[in-house]
Every structure is written in structure tokens, then in C-alpha cells.
Amino acid sequence: MIRLLSIVLPVTLWLAPAHAQERAPVRDAIRIVQLQPAQGVLRRYPDALPSLLRHMNEETGAKFDTDPLFIETLTDERLFQHPILYLNCDEQPNLALPEEEKQALRQYLDRGGFLYLDAGIKASFLGADLGHSYAAWEERPEIKELFAGIYPEKVFVPLPRDHDLFRCFYKGLPDNNDLKIQADQKKLPEAVLTFVEREKWPQGTYSFVGMRVKDRLAILASPICAMGWGKDEFGAWIPPISFRIRESAEGFDENLKLASFTGGTYEVKREDGLNDVIYSEPGQRPLWVREPTGKWRISKYYSGEEISNYAHAFYTRIGCNVFLYALTN
């Protein structure tokens, strides 16, 4: 039986070799297991999880080993010695696991283990290298297929905004103390702050889907969070993050419906069950969206130190809540 220890995070794309040198674990510390690709495959955000674990050690009184234990296969017996398995789905070329690994994963979850599938939600309209921050409350097709073979009787369900995960340690959105920049720079542009508070991350929540095993939340999937956890050796957030928000203006509803485009359209499910339609151009970021009400808005990207720091602070708070919730529930 897995012993769940009771206890009392910073993202641009960085690549590193998948294999890290194994070293002795920290005594009496909680160690996170991370699935890595095969030898020689580069992994994304190598500084992310260690940075998040250091943050939790500093801010929560928890004691985590800041070096994850990397395993190459889910049949590795060391998996069963630790309560949490972290998997960045963007690092995996595919998730078509052999049957013995599927059985090992089911056994791990049935015995009390917790699986966090970072980047387990991915919007097709964003392309391979872009993050995701709103709507599309559905797991990736390969995730759905994998767990149909492990728990055929179960489905992923969106976490409601009032779920305990969103308030188990941090609550709400970051404030000025989280931004780590000069006071006169801390205020976000009004259009950005309004969209964040009302639509992007309302009440400090995020798009998660989960699956329950034996009456507990045992599997959690989200859009990529690791991009917001990393810090460099000087304590600065890496990488810079931009915000994608939706903006409207007088005449948009009439003009955009008449505009021409040569890219694809993508339906994205919202948490209210309705669909947005995203319009794009080849090789470009999403351009505009038609919402279920008939309203049209454009996607606009904002960048800057205060925006990037705000995003990192938010993703770190969410990451912290995920791991603390997993340990205490």
C-alpha cells in the first residue's frame, strides 16, 4: 500500500536531456516520480518541477526532495514507493503504453497513487508549441484512449470552479506581493486584468479534468502549467510568458463575420458545454473567435515583465495546490 505522507511553483520552452544522474534521495522528504521519454529524447521545462518543489519547501513548510525520481517505464517498482506520479504529456511522443504498463498504472492508482497529467488538455487550434489557457475542457484524444483501456467504465469530468483544489493552500489570483517587480510597474493593463478576472482565470481557477478512483480524485489533467514554474539560478522567472486575451470593439460583430480567412476553424468546448469557433490563418496564432451568443472577438497578445511575472505567480500557485491537494486527499 502506498503511504501518503501528510505535509504541512515558474514558463518558456527549455530543452534538456531526458536522463538525469540518479543520486541518493533526501531523507524523510516527499519525492515526486516523473515519467521520462526514451534515452536521448529532449524534455521540456527541465527546471520547472524542481523550481516548484523548492517553492513549496520555502512557502508551505512541506519537505520535498527537489530532484524528481525519473523512471523510464511504469513497471519500475520504485513507482509504488511514492505517492505522486507527474507526467508532462508534451514530452511523450505517444501514450500508447504496452499492456503491462497499463496494468501497473491501474494498480498504482488503485492502491492510492495520484497521477498529474500536465498538458493533458491541448487545444488543436494552438499548434504544437503554444500554451493554452481557456476553454477546451477535454482531455487530449490520446489520454482518452489510454484510460479507456485502463478504466473503461470511467470518464474524465471537468473540475467545478468551487472544487477544494482551488483553495487548499492558495486562494484567488496573485496580488502585488507575488509579482516581484517595482511597485510602479505592478499594475496590469486594464484590458488584461479585466479579462483575467472575468474569463481567463476567474477566482484563481483553471481548466482541469479529473477521474475518480475508489471515491477519490486520482487522476488530474490540465493545459500546460510547467511553463510557469521555472526559475534560473538567480531566482528570476523563466521563460517570459505573454497573455492571449479576447477583445471586442465597435463594428466587430458585423465586420469579422464578413472577413476572409484561409486557415482552419476549430470548435472548442467551454466549461458551460457550449462551443466557441476559432478562426485561424496558416502558420499564425488564432485570430478571432465566434462565441455561442453570436458575438465576435479578436485574440490579442500582451507581453511585458508585469504580465509575465503575474502569469508565473499564478501557475506556481496552481501547481502548489495540485501537489498539496494530492498529498492531503
Feature locations, PLM:
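Short alpha-beta junction capping motif
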Residues: 84-131
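Bacterial N-terminal signal peptides
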Residues: 3-16
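Solvent-exposed loop/turn segments at secondary-structure junctions
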Residues: 37-41, 91-94, 115, 121-126, ...
